[in-house]
From Swiss-Prot:
Pfam families membership: Anticodon_1 (PF08264), tRNA-synt_1 (PF00133), tRNA-synt_1_2 (PF13603)
UniProt xrefs under InterPro entries: aa-tRNA-synth_I_CS, aa-tRNA-synth_Ia, Leu-tRNA-ligase, Leu_tRNA-synth_edit, M/V/L/I-tRNA-synth_anticd-bd, Rossmann-like_a/b/a_fold, tRNAsynth_Ia_anticodon-bd, Val/Leu/Ile-tRNA-synth_edit
Gene this chain is encoded by: leuS
GO BP annotations listed: leucyl-tRNA aminoacylation
Record-listed ATP binding positions: 641
Sequence similarity: Belongs to the class-I aminoacyl-tRNA synthetase family.
PROSITE patterns in the record: AA_TRNA_LIGASE_I
Annotated protein name in UniProt: Leucine--tRNA ligase
Organism field: Leptospira biflexa serovar Patoc (strain Patoc 1 / ATCC 23582 / Paris)
Annotated motif 'KMSKS' region, positions: 638-642
Location, primary (coarse class): cytoplasm
Source lineage: Bacteria, Pseudomonadati, Spirochaetota, Spirochaetia, Leptospirales
Chain positions of motif 'HIGH' region: 40-51
Gene3D superfamilies referenced in this protein's UniProt entry, alphabetically: 3.10.20.590, HUPs (3.40.50.620), Isoleucyl-tRNA Synthetase, Domain 1 (1.10.730.10)
Length: 867
């Protein structure tokens, strides 16, 4: 008879719910352990079998930690704002709030059916006003702050205002403030509200900017670069066009975001992805003079040592000087090219393997190191306006993209680094020296990369045409979306154009109910249609303003949810400071590698601002990060409806039980690797759990049976090895080998007629993190009246981990030729004698002169022979 998993699982899930077994006492005196999953977006499709993989892993860890005496915080919630729900509402007429609630109910039911030990009292949803009140509150904390360069941290904007009132713009002109914006303290005081706000916008960590964005007309919204591929693959077209958008000044934190990665125990690949995304480089900003305009083009280069190899300049199509540079003959071609580029995202434009395109402007610049040399000026989509200065000096001999472009447009290729050039390939080297690189202005020939770099910096700065600069690839965060289903931005615009941040007492700014979710057609979000909601009357002055109609991106709610879990029902503060100090940082964070950059970078950014402002006590939110591998279809392809290879966890739970699904997903292979689904594998794990059940039930009636007998040494060894390996493997996320060890245990005891309770009872505890329903049932049958959830994990005795016999390797002249078993305490003389009895080794030494016999205690014998 198979074990009755349906009855057992329903029974224990009801028990856990009724007794609130997994409720966290945040004020407990126990040591703390915060185990966090990346919370899911509750789609209409419900869970797929990929979701339980990560959730089961964190559940196993949480259950073990409770048994080890920790107070465990293990919560679950929903990242529920976003474009898919809004699109569904547009096609069905069903309000996103309704579909989101239904989807959450489905996800919650499915997750509960897996026996996951979440504290459901802490459940949150990013779409609930009680939650997004704090999203808006954090937004205002960021908006009302600026980055103080001297302190290298965020500071309230009121501090800056006091400085401007006292000292004017003395310390900021040319850095935060553009050159030419100068004023005294008295001049500041005389400025209008709008003028002051325009100046403050250069400092605030949230600001408005007119930038080229990815605009999707059909969706009626801006898409972030990372979203473009997703929606174009669904048939939507995207174009680039300038729009006024809210930005978050994440670039101010680039250095700290980079340096503090050293505090993170994260996968090396994820750390590297974040480093590359931040993209720190050291280079030279250098001006190229354009005689026809009597203006300069400033380029940024990380290789100023190659200046003499620059044979042309390339500007981004959006560069401000393009119109002035373009000659009448080239105007039509340049205009058409700019239009074509506006239809491409940054990701499309920078693909390394794509065909290079561009147009000559008709203008030339002078090479700074030799003004007699004229270099043509092109525009091309492989140069982005958002990086550096939006202009590059092209050195085709030593940069592959420049080389490909030069070949296509028949431009000169001049080698200036010593080395061998190969056909169709540029080459780069920082280990060689400069050649063909001297003029009356500057001499680089024979200099190393480092010396030539420094020579160029000194020369350019002395000439007043350049400066050394640290540059980052990281761009400020585009924070506005022209959508309905998102957090309203708590700002108001008055008629004079000046903004006002809502006060804390005016939060939450609740999303109004709308019947129409289609794009407004004006570039504004559907909130522009909420006429009554739009009108704002200042409670202090009575002044009438208009609410901001953009909403926040989906990333906003996930930037801090780990904090709200700690204190989810606090209506007065984001989080109680004492609880924050007790529970942060998160000990282990588990989720997909697809979030390696954006969510993790944005949440780190928000956390650092909250840290600077004194709201949190740790510089980083997540101590250890682990990514689960994908679960593929049985065809080894990614699961998708179109492939027809999606497996619904409800079906597996219905046929085999939740414990089977949990155990199988942990047994499939290494946790962090991708693995194909296997129906046969599920069957195998189900058979294993039935064997566990039958081990405790015997006779014709399969009645429960264990014996109060003393275990023998062999039984003790099997047990103690199992409980140690299971514990160690859980700690190292090696769940598959932990399951293998439990299978070894069952194999050995299935063939053993003895059923010693002293061995079987600890095994149930070791099994419980993986198969909690079955373990709870067996625990109760063993005579216990309480749940095993908080029972101490069994301890192992080292003496049972030591084998009486060991394997000793036999070498001849250092090469392995055989091995033999021997007592652990074997003496050298006996070991040498037994080594000579190993038949496999004899052909390599018998009949030869033995020069030496070496014994390495407990490991090997090496017979050294002549010849």
């Amino acid at each position: 008879m198979n074990y009755p998993f349906q009855d057992i699982e329903q029974k224990w899930q009801k028990y856990w719910d009724h007794h609130q077994t997994f409720r966290t006492n945040t004020h407990s005196s126990k040591p703390k352990y915060y185990c966090l999953d990346m919370f899911p977006y509750p789609s209409g499709a419900g869970l797929h079998v990929g979701h339980p993989e990560g959730y089961t892993a964190t559940d196993i860890i949480s259950r073990l930690k409770r048994m080890e005496g920790y107070e465990v915080l293990h919560p679950m919630g929903w990242d529920a704002f976003g474009l898919p729900a809004e699109r569904y509402a547009m096609t069905t007429g069903i309000h996103p709030r309704t579909t989101t609630k239904n989807n959450i109910d489905t996800f919650r039911r499915q997750i509960k059916s897996l026996g996951l030990s979440y504290d459901w009292e802490r459940e949150i949803s990013t779409t609930h006003p009680d939650y997004y009140r704090w999203t808006q509150w954090i937004f205002l904390q960021i908006y009302n702050s600026y980055f103080d360069r001297k302190q290298n941290k965020a500071v309230p904007i009121t501090t800056l205002i006091q400085t401007l009132e006292r000292e004017g713009s003395l310390f900021f002109e040319g850095v935060e403030l553009p050159k030419g914006i100068q004023f005294t303290a008295s001049e500041w005081k005389s400025k209008s509200r709008k003028e002051k706000e325009d100046i403050l916008s250069h400092f605030r960590l949230v600001y408005e900017a007119n930038i080229p964005v990815n605009w999707c007309e059909a969706l009626g919204t801006v898409l972030a670069n990372e979203e473009v591929e997703e929606w174009t693959s669904k048939g939507y077209s995207v174009e680039r066009k300038p729009m006024r958008q809210y930005m978050m000044r994440i670039t101010a934190y680039a250095e700290r975001l980079l340096n503090d990665l050293s505090l993170c125990e994260w996968p090396p690949s994820t750390l590297e992805m974040q480093r590359n995304w931040i993209g720190k480089s050291e280079g030279l900003e250098l001006s190229f003079h354009v005689p026809s305009l009597n203006k300069d083009i400033t380029v940024y280069t990380t290789r100023p040592d190659t200046i003499f190899g620059a044979t042309y300049l390339v500007l981004a199509p959006e560069h401000a000087l393009v119109a002035e540079l373009t000659t009448p003959e080239q105007t039509e071609a340049v205009g058409q090219y700019q239009k074509d580029c506006s239809l491409k995202s940054d990701l499309e434009r920078t693909e390394l393997n794509k065909d290079k395109t561009g147009v000559f402007t008709g203008a030339y610049a002078q090479l700074p190191t030799d003004p007699s040399v004229k270099v043509p000026i092109y525009i091309s989509d492989y140069v982005l306006i958002s990086y550096g200065t939006g202009a590059i000096m092209a050195v085709p001999a030593h940069d592959q993209r420049d080389y490909d472009f030069a070949v296509k447009f028949n431009l000169p290729i001049k080698q200036v680094i010593d080395g061998k050039m190969e056909t169709n390939l540029a080459f780069d080297s920082k280990d060689s020296v400069c050649i063909n690189s001297s003029s009356a202005e500057v001499q680089l020939d024979g200099k190393s990369y480092k010396d030539a770099f420094q020579t160029m910096v000194v020369w350019a700065e002395k000439k007043g045409i350049g400066r050394k600069k640290i540059q980052f690839k990281l761009r400020d965060w585009l924070f506005a979306r022209q959508r309905y289903w998102g957090e309203p931005i708590p700002l108001v615009h008055f008629e004079d154009g000046s903004p006002k941040a809502l006060s804390d007492s005016e939060l939450p700014l609740v999303l109004p109910d709308l019947e129409e979710f289609k794009p407004s057609g004006t570039g504004e979000s559907p909130l522009a249609l909420a006429k009554d909601w739009l009108v704002y009357k200042d409670p202090e002055t009575g002044e009438i303003g208009k609410r901001e109609t953009n909403t926040m991106p989906q990333w906003a709610g996930s930037c801090y949810y780990y904090l709200r879990y700690i204190d989810p029902r606090n209506n007065d503060k984001l989080i109680d400071p004492e609880l924050e100090k007790m529970w942060m940082p998160v000990e282990v964070y588990v989720g997909g590698a697809e979030h390696a950059v954006l969510h993790l970078l944005y949440s780190r950014f928000w956390h650092k601002i909250l840290f600077d402002l004194g709201h949190v006590s740790t510089p980083e939110p997540f101590k250890k990060l682990v990514h689960q591998g994908l679960i593929l279809g049985e065809d080894k392809g990614k699961m998708s409806k179109s492939r027809g290879n999606v497996v619904n966890p409800d079906d597996v739970v219905s046929e085999f039980g939740a414990d089977t699904l949990r155990l199988f997903e942990m047994f499939m292979g290494p946790f962090e690797m991708s693995k194909p689904w296997s129906k046969n594998g599920v069957d195998g794990v189900f058979r294993f759990l039935n064997r566990v059940w039958r081990l405790f039930h015997s006779g014709e009636n399969e009645s429960f049976f264990v014996e109060d007998i003393e275990p023998n040494e062999a039984e003790q060894k099997t047990l103690h090895r199992t409980i140690k390996k299971v514990k160690d493997d859980i700690d190292s996320f090696s769940f598959n080998t932990a399951v293998s060890q439990m299978m070894i245990f069952i194999n050995e005891f299935t063939s053993n007629p003895r059923k010693p309770k002293q061995v079987l009872e600890p095994f149930v505890l070791a099994l419980s993190p993986f198969a909690p329903h079955l373990a709870e049932e067996l625990w109760a049958k063993l005579g216990h009246t309480d749940s095993l959830a908080y029972h101490p994990y069994p301890k192992w005795d080292e003496k049972y981990l030591i084998d009486a016999n060991i394997t000793i390797v036999v070498q001849v002249n250092g090469k392995m030729r055989g091995e033999f078993l021997a007592p652990r305490e074997i003496e050298e003389k006996e070991a040498l004698s037994l080594a000579k009895e190993v038949e496999k080794a004899k052909p390599f030494w018998v009949g030869k002169e033995i020069k030496k016999e070496i014994y390495v205690k407990g490991k090997l014998v090496n017979i050294v022979v002549a010849g």
